[in-house]
Amino acid sequence: MNPLIQSLTESQLRTDIPNFRPGDTVRVHAKVVEGNRERVQIFEGVVISRKGQGISEMYTVRKISSGVGVERTFPTHTPRVEKIEVTRHGKVRRAKLYYLRALQGKAARIKEVRQ
C-alpha cells in the first residue's frame, strides 16, 4: 500500500474499540441526527458478521424488535458510533451467522461463554 495512504488511514483508526466477535451481544451507542439536534441511540443485538479490515472494516448487528428482525451495519472506525459495549460473549463455530435469520424464538439463542 502507498505509504501516504497508509499513514492517513492509520491516523483515522480508533483505539477504543473493544474486542468482539460474531456471536457476541453488543450495545452500540450511535449518534443520530433528528432535524437540528443530535442524540445517542442505543442499538443492542447479536453481531452476525464482521467483514473488511483496517479503516473499511464493518460489522452487522441483528436484534428482534416487536417480533421483526432488524439488522444494522456499522463501520467499525466511524465517529458516528460513540461507543461499543460488549454485553455477553457467545459461543459459535461460524464467522458469519446468517443462519440466524431463518430461526425464531429459542432456536435463535446463542450459548454464552463462561469465563
Swiss-Prot record:
The keyword Ribosomal protein applies. The keyword Flavoprotein does not apply. One of its GO terms (biological process) is translation. Gene3D superfamilies: 2.30.30.790. One of its GO terms (molecular function) is structural constituent of ribosome. One of its GO terms (cellular component) is cytosolic large ribosomal subunit. It comes from the Bacteria. Keywords: Ribonucleoprotein, Ribosomal protein. InterPro entries: Ribosomal_bL19 (IPR001857), Ribosomal_bL19_CS (IPR018257), Ribosomal_bL19_sf (IPR038657), Translation_prot_SH3-like_sf (IPR008991). Pfam families: Ribosomal_L19 (PF01245). This protein is located at the 30S-50S ribosomal subunit interface and may play a role in the structure and function of the aminoacyl-tRNA binding site. NCBIfam families: rplS_bact. Belongs to the bacterial ribosomal protein bL19 family. PANTHER family: LARGE RIBOSOMAL SUBUNIT PROTEIN BL19M, RIBOSOMAL PROTEIN L19. This is Large ribosomal subunit protein bL19. It comes from Streptococcus mutans serotype c (strain ATCC 700610 / UA159). The lineage of its organism: Bacteria, Bacillati, Bacillota, Bacilli, Lactobacillales.
